[in-house]
Amino acid sequence: MKVNKFTKEKSEFEERVVEIARVSRVVKGGRRIRFRILVVIGDQKGRVGYGIAKATEIATGVKKAVSLAKKHLITVPIIADTIPYQVTQEFGSARILLKPAPIGTSIVAGGVVRIIAELVGIKNLVSKVLGTANKINNVKAVFAALSSFDPERVEQAKKQMEKLKNPKSEVQNPKQTKSKKDQIKSNKKVSNLEN
């Protein structure tokens, strides 16, 4: 496809506008009205970022917020379509609880947590938003929670998941081992022969 100034190239990130707020500043001539835009972007492969920008027009504000979000990306460890372990985070009066969920649960979360989880690529998650309903503080709390994973605990969670997926059989050769019933029978035969 030929690229010119009218065709839009496809970005690697999906972007979602979380909030548009009309804000004003009082100046000498009256009120100066602008828009504050909160945007979250993600590639659904573990990378996600957010940006907050102000502009007199919504379109320019969204562009500013997207460019800020691209500068502040974080990478989230995803194990079996969920997070490695439960995490709780506070930011201001916002408190966020994120719990890993088994396959098939889907995203049990509301508001900004659902949007961020979808953009990260998490498919199974249980979440609870406690405290404020302020979207900016909730986004910051979720990002703080997602970037707070300890690499050592993540590795432990990966190893546990691999053990669950591929349980190694303790029995290498089934002919060598006997069931409990067979062992009891053979013990009885030996004791009968001795008598």
Regions inferred by a protein language model and the residue ranges of each:
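Intrinsically disordered, compositionally biased charged tails
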Residues: 1-13, 152-195
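N-terminal, positively charged regions that mediate nucleic acid binding
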Residues: 1-36, 41, 45, 193-195
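Amphipathic alpha-helical transducer elements in NTP-driven molecular machines
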Residues: 17-20, 58-63, 106, 110, ...
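Conserved mixed alpha/beta catalytic, RNA-binding, or beta-rich assembly cores of soluble enzyme
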Residues: 36-73, 79-81, 99
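Short, ordered loop/turn segments at secondary-structure junctions
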Residues: 44-45, 53-55, 101-103, 112, ...
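Glycine/charge-rich, flexible interdomain linkers and switch-proximal surface loops
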Residues: 75-99, 157-165
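Positively charged, low-complexity, intrinsically disordered RNA-binding extensions
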Residues: 108-165
